[in-house]
Amino acid sequence: MAEENQTTPADAAQAAQGPQFAIQRIYTKDISFETPNSPAIFQKEWKPEVQLDLDTRSALIEENVYEIVLAVTVTAMLGEETAFLCEVQQAGIFAIGEMPEQNKAHMLGSFCPNTLFPYARETISNLVNRGTFPPLNLAPVNFDAIFAAYMQKRAAQQAQEQAPTQLDA
């Protein structure tokens, strides 16, 4: 006789109350692409120095629903001249149910930006291509490491602020 997988109402209620996560929407919030030194920049040998800057922010928009914005700025320089400057704000609306604050902070600061990054990377690649520059393939970003470094820095700052001050006698 085959075993049946039965779920009791108590099991279902417990599962429903566990941590929950859902992506409600992913969208591009803002885009900018500049080629301040065109068309002269197209005549130069293409050996750029590429700088990648990342920033994230989150905002509670209603109970347990957050907007996360991942801002990605890519600057390509040829010597002292800017070949292009590409800025993308990739955003998402995420429903994050009740969970411990540490877990929620990780979701907001690492998991959600990690979800958004491939969309931003694709948008940047398309913009660079439309600017007629050689392909730009951004490497994956370790948002877990970035978030861990941020949390360590924040903990060190809080410890420093709470440290008792010594007075010289």
From Swiss-Prot:
It comes from the Bacteria. Gene3D superfamilies: SecB-like (3.10.420.10). One of its GO terms (molecular function) is unfolded protein binding. GO terms for cellular component: cytoplasm. Keywords: Chaperone, Cytoplasm, Protein transport, Translocation, Transport. Its main location: cytoplasm. One of its GO terms (biological process) is protein tetramerization. It is found in: Cytoplasm. Pfam families: SecB (PF02556). Belongs to the SecB family. One of the proteins required for the normal export of preproteins out of the cell cytoplasm. It is a molecular chaperone that binds to a subset of precursor proteins, maintaining them in a translocation-competent state. It also specifically binds to its receptor SecA. Homotetramer, a dimer of dimers. One homotetramer interacts with 1 SecA dimer. This is Protein-export protein SecB.
